[in-house]
């Protein structure tokens, strides 16, 4: 077969495989609609074509997530490296892969003497889990980690690297000092780059998995997380491009893209902490021009986080495990629950103007006053700006 036709065939098979539950659901619903008069009447009343597609999407999603995970690879002879294991997703993933999935785990911790690192050592006491110091901004420490992994594989292959370490700062773009934006990129982007480039030769040899933890924020940016969204968009772009480059080696690259979850990265600051950071880092003139908006914005951020953040962080860990162990892996693993998945999927496909309108409904209603030049809440009395002197 011609190489182009061969690639087209493989691509079609991959699409059919990844979305098999949706095709099956659509076919089953069409057959049932012909056999069951009541179902046919309901679909016709709702608009047959549209209702059929919606029902297929819902049932396909449920089937994919709950029943059709497909075969998994065996963990025997395989090791994994995880960054950011001090707390959160990385900490729980390290325990899951070592204890339940029986992988050899190298758990990279920013602080190898932290409570989280000590807990890992206590829970997994044999040679199945190694806690190693790993600051993803430190190139020398990453090289040390590579040497340690090579020396302690004990006949295993490095099957997967999960680049999980990440940081976030909830501040609007104008308020964040350049040094903090550089730090976000150093951890979230360059940290992923450093770790990936260092361990790619081992992953190519094992024909394994490179798993990059991104975020839904990498697909649509909202207020107060613009630099964070920029970093996660870069990670998604890296995963898509690198996956295409590594396909010839049999190495798969995937992203895990969580929604908001109740972890330290989202709940590490109170409203008072945010205001203190704002007063410390933002020039006085800009503080005055923004008026009461920052206090309301911080209250809005925390209120939104409490309302939409999902409590079960094991949903994310489950998807991380799937990315490592699925025999037919996805390209992108979403962690959001059905309702959030449906809403965010709809938002992703809207044009930018519609996205702007949709997002604006959930933000504090402030506008700049033409006379004073100050940012005022809509409906608040106008203030005349008085120049000093």
Where are the regions that the model predicts?
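The beta1-alpha1 cofactor-binding region of Rossmann-like NAD(H)/NADP(H)-dependent oxidoreductases
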Residues: 114, 134-147, 178
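Conserved NAD(P)H cofactor-binding loop of Rossmann-fold oxidoreductase domains
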Residues: 164-169
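Active-site helix of classical SDR
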Residues: 196, 231-234
């Amino acid at each position: 077969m011609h190489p182009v036709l061969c690639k087209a065939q493989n691509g079609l098979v991959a699409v059919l495989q990844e979305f098999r539950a949706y095709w099956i659901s659509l076919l089953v619903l069409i057959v049932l609609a012909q056999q069951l008069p009541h179902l046919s009447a309901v679909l016709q009343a709702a608009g047959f074509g549209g209702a059929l597609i919606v029902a297929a999407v819902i049932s396909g999603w449920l089937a994919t997530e709950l029943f059709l995970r497909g075969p998994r690879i065996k963990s025997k002879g395989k090791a994994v490296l995880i960054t950011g294991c001090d707390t959160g997703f990385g900490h729980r993933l390290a325990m899951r892969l070592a204890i339940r999935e029986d992988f050899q785990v190298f758990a990279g911790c920013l602080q190898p003497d932290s409570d989280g690192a000590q807990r890992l050592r206590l829970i997994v006491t044999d040679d199945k889990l190694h806690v190693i110091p790993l600051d993803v901004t430190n190139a020398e420490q990453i090289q040390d980690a590579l040497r340690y992994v090579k020396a302690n594989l004990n006949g295993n292959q490095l099957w997967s690297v999960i680049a999980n370490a990440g940081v976030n700062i909830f501040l609007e773009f104008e308020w964040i000092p350049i040094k903090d934006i550089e730090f976000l990129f150093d951890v979230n982007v360059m940290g992923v780059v450093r770790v990936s480039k260092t361990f790619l030769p081992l992953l190519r040899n094992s024909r394994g998995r490179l798993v990059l933890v991104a975020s839904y924020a990498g697909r649509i940016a909202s207020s107060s997380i613009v630099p964070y969204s920029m970093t996660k968009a870069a990670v998604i772009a890296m995963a898509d491009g690198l996956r295409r480059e590594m396909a010839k080696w049999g190495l798969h690259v995937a992203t895990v893209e969580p929604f908001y979850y109740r972890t330290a990265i989202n709940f590490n600051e109170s409203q008072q902490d945010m205001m203190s950071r704002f007063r410390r880092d933002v020039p006085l003139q800009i503080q005055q021009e923004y008026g009461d908006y920052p206090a309301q914005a911080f209250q809005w951020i925390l209120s939104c986080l409490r309302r939409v953040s999902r409590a079960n962080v094991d949903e994310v860990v489950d998807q991380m495990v799937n990315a490592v162990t699925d025999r037919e892996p996805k390209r992108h693993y979403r962690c959001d629950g059905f309702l959030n998945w449906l809403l965010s999927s709809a938002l992703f496909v809207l044009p930018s103007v519609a996205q702007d309108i949709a997002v604006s409904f959930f933000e504090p209603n402030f506008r700049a006053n033409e006379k004073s030049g100050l940012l005022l809440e809509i409906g608040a009395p106008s203030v005349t700006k008085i120049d000093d002197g």
